[in-house]
């Protein structure tokens, strides 16, 4: 009981001390002031009862209210009508701008359908001038047969390396500065050197689906006006990357172009028309993006295709597209393919699944054990090389049956691709090479010259390197940027490389006059 009394005594003393402290701080009137500023009337005043003033309390000094800060409120909350001609009209303009942006985006991504005239895509030039410009390339005398006659003259072993180095001592084109040679607008993804030997023509494609044709001038076309510009014609044929450009083997006036949007189109330079040869789809109507294509050596009317999803097909241009037989050669993207010139039924593929495979197109496998899919049959795998990282490219030498590949492991590997291939390929030569590209540079791909056993590949240190089929370096052609995509002229010692801004670098075997 005594302990309880002591506790109550201390509690009362604490209460008294706290009350005295509150009086000294003048905090007694704060609750009433808060209610007053909030607009809440004291219930005692509302009821008419008198409020007794306690004795001994100091009067509370009221402070002036701060000016209210303006806040944003909608007209609906304020109960006001909307200004139909003002703000409503502004909202309509905003909606119209959004609609126009959506329509423009849809238009940029729209796929070109059907047969068209190229002059309809080029508004800056006259139809007659365009026809006259490219009619000189409509020389139908050039064909695959002429190419094979050239090969027959090179059926002997390679000349000594020193002579090849002299042949590959190429000079950079200097009539125009490379900064002016924008063959396309975006990053170059495909290049083709037209086989004409009298006049140089280079065709390129970019990531936006634009195709450009550069009519190369060997000297300044107008010496009195040094500020003249290169003769480049561009038109947008596709909605996605241009993956491959080739010249028809039976008609050099026609160009074949393929794209990631699944389209395969021809470009006729004699009539300046583009025909749609194929819109690659599966049985469900899904578009199959074309990653690479090549004309068959057996039949110049047959085009072999690979896709971004690992499919493979052969398209006979004389038949309807729905007659194609789709096969599966990989579960992932096939980035590059190559047909063996000595065995046209043999095809090599480079895939994102880190393999280089050689296939026999004469044999079919209903359910390949290497695939996780059961949608398509496959061809028989003859030989395989397993890489540490993805394989970017494959290419066959025209004479000595060498197969070259390069990938993201910064190596170039050379294989003996003669008959009786082992099931597991092993490279004869391995070259350490800076060929791993990044996000903003097109994939670097080694390409053999079509009439010699030499190949070229871009170097991430801004150059084009040329090697023999035994890995002996012949040339190092320096450039100001990375010429990621390269293309040889099929007959002459001319080579071109394209960079990530649409510009090209041309090298020839004689200095410009």
Curated annotation (Swiss-Prot):
The species this protein was found in: Eremothecium gossypii (strain ATCC 10895 / CBS 109.51 / FGSC 9923 / NRRL Y-1056) (Yeast)
Pfam families hit by this protein: WD40
Keywords: DNA damage, DNA-binding, Repeat, WD repeat
Keyword Oxidoreductase on entry: no
GO MF assignments: DNA binding
Region Disordered, annotated ranges: 35-103
Biased composition (Basic and acidic residues): 35-45
Origin: domain of life: Eukaryota
Keyword DNA damage applies: yes
Recorded family membership: Belongs to the WD repeat DDB2/WDR76 family.
Function: DNA-binding protein that binds to both single- and double-stranded DNA. Binds preferentially to UV-damaged DNA. May be involved in DNA-metabolic processes.
Protein name: DNA damage-binding protein CMR1
GO biological process: DNA damage response; regulation of DNA damage checkpoint
SMART domains found in the cross-reference section: WD40
WD repeats: 183-224, 237-277, 329-369, 386-425, 438-477, 478-513
GO cellular component terms, semicolon-separated: chromatin; cytoplasm; nuclear periphery; nucleus
């Amino acid at each position: 009981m005594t302990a309880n009394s002591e506790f109550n005594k201390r509690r009362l003393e604490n209460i008294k001390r706290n009350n005295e402290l509150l009086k000294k701080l003048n905090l007694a009137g704060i609750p009433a002031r808060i209610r007053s500023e909030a607009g809440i009337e004291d219930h005692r005043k509302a009821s008419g009862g008198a409020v007794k003033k306690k004795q001994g309390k100091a009067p509370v000094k009221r402070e002036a209210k701060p000016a209210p800060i303006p806040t944003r409120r909608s007209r609906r909350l304020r109960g006001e009508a909307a200004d139909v001609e003002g703000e409503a009209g502004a909202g309509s303009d905003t909606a119209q701008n959004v609609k126009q942006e959506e329509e423009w985006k849809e238009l940029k991504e729209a796929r070109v359908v059907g047969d068209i005239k190229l002059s309809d895509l080029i508004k800056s030039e006259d139809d007659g001038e365009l026809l006259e410009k490219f009619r000189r390339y409509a020389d139908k005398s050039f064909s695959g047969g002429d190419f094979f006659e050239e090969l027959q003259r090179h059926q002997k072993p390679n000349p000594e390396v020193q002579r090849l180095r002299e042949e590959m001592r190429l000079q950079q084109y200097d009539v125009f500065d490379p900064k002016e040679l924008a063959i396309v607008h975006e990053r170059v993804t495909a290049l083709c050197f037209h086989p004409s030997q009298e006049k140089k023509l280079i065709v390129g494609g970019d990531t936006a689906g634009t195709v450009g044709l550069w009519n190369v001038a060997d000297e300044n076309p107008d010496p009195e006006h040094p500020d003249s510009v290169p003769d480049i014609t561009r038109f947008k044929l596709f909605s996605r990357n241009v993956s491959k450009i080739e010249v028809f083997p039976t008609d050099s006036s026609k160009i074949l172009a393929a794209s990631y949007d699944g389209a395969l189109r021809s470009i006729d330079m004699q009539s300046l028309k583009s025909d749609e040869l194929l819109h690659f789809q599966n049985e469900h109507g899904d578009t199959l993006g074309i990653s690479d294509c090549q004309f068959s050596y057996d039949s110049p009317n047959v085009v072999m295709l690979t896709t971004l999803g690992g499919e493979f097909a052969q398209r006979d241009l004389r038949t309807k597209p729905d007659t194609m037989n789709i096969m599966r050669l990989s579960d992932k993207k096939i980035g590059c393919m190559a047909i063996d010139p000595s065995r046209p039924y043999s095809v090599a593929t480079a895939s994102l699944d880190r393999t280089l495979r050689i296939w026999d197109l004469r044999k079919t496998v209903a359910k390949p054990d290497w695939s996780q899919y059961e949608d398509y049959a496959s061809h028989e795998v003859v030989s395989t090389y397993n890489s540490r990282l993805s394989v970017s490219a494959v290419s066959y030498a025209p004479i000595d049956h060498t197969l070259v590949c390069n990938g993201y492991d910064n190596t170039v590997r050379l294989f003996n691709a003669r008959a009786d291939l082992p099931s597991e390929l092993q490279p004869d030569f391995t070259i350490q090479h800076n060929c791993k590209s990044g996000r903003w540079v097109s994939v670097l791909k080694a390409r053999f010259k079509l009439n010699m056993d030499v190949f070229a590949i871009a170097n991430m240190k801004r150059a084009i390197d040329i090697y023999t089929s035994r890995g002996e370096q012949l040339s190092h052609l320096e450039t100001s940027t990375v010429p990621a995509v390269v293309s040889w002229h099929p007959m002459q010692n001319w080579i071109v490389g394209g960079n990530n801004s649409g510009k090209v670098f041309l090298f020839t075997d004689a200095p410009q006059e």
